[in-house]
């Protein structure tokens, strides 16, 4: 389960991540990443948490399939939060093929997209 402080909820936060962040597309999903502030934090001030949100449209499938895809993506992102810069906003948008994909395929696409966004991969 994704902890409460790591959930992206407000429309403005989703819009910021999608419009001002970097994007990496894969066959099953698209990941938008808006990196956190680059300014060093004052002593005693903790870094803001990385927050993630998910977009799974009706094109992915019916309600049961959409919720299953969201649960899988939440679990995958939760395991990868420590690899993301503090204060980042992440939006994972599932594409229609995600409804037919298994956990391993979603994990592979998510890892490839995050690696590309964090500077470790090529197109």
UniProtKB/Swiss-Prot annotation:
One of its GO terms (cellular component) is ribonuclease P complex. This is Ribonuclease P protein component. RNaseP catalyzes the removal of the 5'-leader sequence from pre-tRNA to produce the mature 5'-terminus. It can also cleave other RNA substrates such as 4.5S RNA. The protein component plays an auxiliary but essential role in vivo by binding to the 5'-leader sequence and broadening the substrate specificity of the ribozyme. It catalyses: Endonucleolytic cleavage of RNA, removing 5'-extranucleotides from tRNA precursor. The keyword Lyase does not apply. It is an enzyme of class 3 (hydrolase). GO terms for molecular function: 3'-tRNA processing endoribonuclease activity; ribonuclease P activity; tRNA binding. GO terms for biological process: tRNA 5'-leader removal. Disulfide bonds: none annotated. InterPro entries: Ribosomal_Su5_D2-typ_SF, Ribsml_uS5_D2-typ_fold_subgr, RNase_P, RNase_P_CS. Consists of a catalytic RNA component (M1 or rnpB) and a protein subunit. Its EC number is 3.1.26.5. The keyword tRNA processing applies. It comes from Streptomyces bikiniensis. SUPFAM superfamilies: Ribosomal protein S5 domain 2-like. The lineage of its organism: Bacteria, Bacillati, Actinomycetota, Actinomycetes, Kitasatosporales. Keywords: Endonuclease, Hydrolase, Nuclease, RNA-binding, tRNA processing. Belongs to the RnpA family. It holds the Pfam family Ribonuclease_P.
């Amino acid at each position: 389960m994704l902890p409460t402080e790591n959930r992206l909820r407000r429309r403005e936060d989703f819009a910021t991540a999608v419009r001002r962040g970097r994007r990496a597309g894969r066959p099953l999903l698209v990941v938008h990443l808006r990196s956190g502030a680059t300014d060093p934090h004052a002593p005693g001030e903790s870094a803001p948490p990385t927050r993630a949100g998910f977009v799974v449209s009706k094109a992915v499938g019916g309600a049961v399939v959409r919720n299953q895809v969201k649960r899988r993506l939440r679990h995958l992102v939760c395991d990868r939060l420590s690899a993301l810069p503090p204060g980042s906003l992440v939006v994972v948008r599932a594409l229609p093929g995600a409804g037919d994909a298994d956990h391993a395929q979603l994990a592979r696409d998510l890892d490839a997209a995050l690696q590309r966004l964090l500077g470790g991969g090529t197109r």
